[in-house]
Amino acid sequence: MAELSTRYNLPANVTEKSINLDLNSTARWIKEPSVGGWTVKWGNFVFHIPNTGMTLLHHLKSNFVVPEWQQTRNLFSHLFKNPKSTIIEPFLALRILLGVALKDQELQQSLIPGFRSIVHMLSEWLLLEVTSAIHISPNLLGIYLTSDMFKILMAGVKNFFNKMFTLHVVNDHGKPSSIEIKLTGQQIIITRVNMGFLVEVRRIDIEPCCGETILSESVVFGLVAEAVLREHSQMEKGQPLNLTQYMNSKIAI
């Protein structure tokens, strides 16, 4: 009778073992206070988030601003002149960025169905909730989120960060400064500004008669400092740099 045999086995990859990937780390959002901000752990990333720009955003949203800042208030009037807009903290703006980075992979790549469903669940959790964990069946994780898939997922997030750094700071030369994505019920706009990345989430209403999308006045927005993402991205030659290279950018943030 023919029997199964393990006569020939390739030696285990020692390097792979030493990495000791925690696949469940994608389903956990760990936020801890630090000096001047927060530390956030998600996946194999550790983000050091300063409390940068919060005071400035609140000041721009008030009516007591210096004349030089009026241009910024006019450009982003739906944020700074809108009583229905809400400022969120930097770690929540980062969470939205990560959700968009996953959604970008889900929409653009040919992922196997099981893996795609996990990416979808993770992106929806990051974008729509503020909970510290999401329950995904260990069996599902073990089958579809292997160590190789985990690495692909994390590499995709880094690639999205790299894409963000190809943006120019808001300018008067017509060069692209924003990434936009439309999802069910919301539009997310990521704009490169002097201090980093302005993240805004606009609610979208569908008009019953003609099916057109109408942006409602309800919007949340926050600022992620450039340094938060810089340490996790790889700048290529010729990519735009920050404020020191943009003397023409007259925005206040």
UniProtKB/Swiss-Prot annotation:
> What is the membrane topology here?
Peripheral membrane protein
Q: What is this protein called?
A: Membrane-associated protein VP24
Q: Which residues form a coiled coil?
A: none
Q: Which GO terms describe its molecular function?
A: structural constituent of virion
The task this protein performs is described as: May act as a minor matrix protein that plays a role in assembly of viral nucleocapsid and virion budding. Unlike Ebola VP24, mVP24 has no measurable impact of host dendritic cell function.
Compartment annotation: Virion membrane; Host cell membrane; Host endomembrane system
Q: Which GO terms describe its biological process?
A: viral process
Q: Record's superkingdom?
A: Viruses
Its family? Answer: Belongs to the filoviridae membrane-associated protein VP24 family.
Q: List the keywords (alphabetical).
A: Host cell membrane, Host membrane, Membrane, Viral matrix protein, Virion
GO cellular-component term (any)? host cell endomembrane system
Gene giving rise to this polypeptide? VP24
The organism named in the record is Lake Victoria marburgvirus (strain Ozolin-75) (MARV)
Subunit description? Monomer or homotetramer (Potential). Interacts with the nucleoprotein.
Got any disulfides in this one, which pairs?
Answer: none
